[in-house]
Amino acid sequence: SGLEVEVVPSTFKADDLIARFEAKEIGGIFLSNGPGDPLTLINEKEQVQKLIGANIPMFAICLGHQMLSIAHGYDTYKLKFGQHGGNHPVAYNGVVEITAQNHNYNVPDNIVEIADITHQNLFDNTIEGVKYKNKEIFSVQHHPEASPGPHESKYIFAQFAKIVK
């Protein structure tokens, strides 16, 4: 995709990234996956809220997807049964993608107040992806980066690259 990626720790300071965005040193932020209960990540929530307020384009997966929801004021909830494995069907634009998943938490249905649902889990109808209204921010719950696969969701990275170039 021709992008240069720089990894920053989870202890990042939003003000530093905002300054770099305003100086055109970075074109966007990717919030990655990770372990644990997203509601316990108070500092990270505050930092993501600052990034949202700065209108920086963002793409997130799994824990990052959950953090965007929480930072927008929509708390996640724990699933009765976590979703784990490499064969979870997800609907996107009338197409079924087979996805890799590994999570115990999900974003709430009322996120539709501020985001459009882009991906839906076909096992339990939980939300698998959203695009925030009037923002260049989108996210998915599953793992499009999964290797060795499945790879049906790789297009998501190209969508983000198009926004940040």
Give, region by region, the residue ranges found by the protein language model.
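Structured helix-beta-strand junction loops
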Residues: S1, K24, A54-N55, E113-I114, ...
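Catalytic beta-strand/loop cores that center a nucleophilic Ser/Cys/Thr
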Residues: V95-K135
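Short acidic loop-to-helix transition motifs that present clustered carboxylates
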Residues: V8-L17, D37
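Hydrophobic anchor at the start of a short beta-strand
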Residues: V5, M58, I137
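A glycine-centered loop/beta-turn motif at secondary-structure junctions
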Residues: G129-K165
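Short helix-loop-beta junction
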Residues: S1-V8
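Active-site glycine-centered loops adjacent to acidic/histidine catalytic or metal-binding residues
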Residues: C62, H103, H143
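Cysteine-nucleophile active-site neighborhood
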Residues: R20-I98, P150-Q159
